[in-house]
C-alpha cells in the first residue's frame, strides 16, 4: 500500500479568525492582535491549509479481484503484491447503444479482456474524437484509379448475372478491395420490376409468396412504400458491410439518423461507388435503363442531404466531395443520353415498364394500375428529365461553397474544376432540351 509522506510542522494563519471573517486587516500580534484586544474577543489563529497536491490514498480493489482472491484463484497475467498500484478503469456508455466499453489504464484480467474496447476506440474516447467509416477513397492502400477501373469483362452466353451468397462474402478476406468487388456479381437492374423483385428478393430473403406485380392492388402499395428496390439495397449492403446484414442507408429509403458517435456518410458513398462503377450495372455497349438512372439520381440527392445534416463529418472530406462529383457527373451523362434518345425517337425507357398484364401496345408504360398514353409519353419523360437535372444544380452550388471552406491545394482545385464542368453540362443539357 502507498504510504503518505509525514506531515510537516503545522503552520498557523497570518491573521486571526475574527479578522479573517470580518475581512479586516490584522496586525498579527500574538497571543492577541490589536483588534481582538479592543473588541475583547478571543484571538484564535487557525492552522493554515497545506499547499501542493493532496496525498495519494490507496485505491480500493475491484470486485472481480476480491472475488477471485476469496476463491484462491489468480490470473497469471496480473501480479498481486501488496504495494502494487491497482488498476484503474472507467466505464463509458454510448448514448443510444447497449454496449458497455471499458477503458483500461493497465493490464487487464482474463475476465475483462472480452469487454475491453480496442486501442483505437480507447484513443477516440480519450481524445474526444468520433468514429469514422472510411470510404474506399480514404484508404491509402487503394488507389483512386483502381476503384473506377473495374474490368468490363463479362462471360459470353450469360444473359444475367448471379449474386454471390452471404457465406461466400463472409469467407472472403477483404470484400471491399477492388479484386474482391470484381469477384462479386451485383444483380443488374432489369427492365421491369417483376424481374427485379423476383430475382433479388427470392435469393436474399427466400420469398415464396405471390409477387406484388401479379396483384395490381399490392403493386401500388409496394411502389408507394419504395420497397421495390429493397433487394438491390440489400445486395449493396452485402458488399459494403463484409457480408453482414446491416440496416440500409440509401437515398431511396428512409435514411438512418446520425447518432452522436457514428457517421454513415462514407458508407453511403462506398455504396454509390459500387453502383456506378460495377460492370454488371454499367456496360459500355448498352444504355443504362432509365429506372436505374432515376434510382442513382435519388441516391445522389439523398447522400447530399445526409452529408449536409451530418454533424460529425461536416462535409470536410475532399475525397467524399470528389467521389460525389464524379458520380453526379455520371448521372448527368445518363440523363443527357435519355434526352438524346427522346429527340432521336429511340426507345430506352424499358425500365419504366412494370407489366401487370400483357399490353396491347408494347410501347405503353404501366406504373401500378396507371397507363400512360403513347402521345404523352415523350413529353412527360422530357419534363421528368428536366426536373431531375434542375434538382442537381443546387447540389453543385453547395459543393462549390463547401470546397471553398477547405484548405487550398491540388485536390481542392480539381474539385472546383469538376463541379464547374458538371454545372455547365447541366445548363447545356437544359438549353438543348428547350430548343
UniProtKB/Swiss-Prot annotation:
Keyword Protein biosynthesis: yes or no?
no
Q: Which residues cross the membrane?
A: none
Q: Which PROSITE patterns match?
A: ZN2_CY6_FUNGAL_1, ZN2_CY6_FUNGAL_2
Give the UniProt keywords, A-Z.
DNA-binding, Metal-binding, Nucleus, Transcription, Transcription regulation, Zinc
SUPFAM superfamilies membership: Zn2/Cys6 DNA-binding domain
Q: Which residues bind DNA?
A: 16-43
Q: What is its subcellular localisation? A: Nucleus
Q: Which domain of life is it from?
A: Eukaryota
Name this protein carries in UniProt:
Transcription activator AKTR-2
Q: Which organism is it from?
A: Alternaria alternata
Gene label: AKTR-2
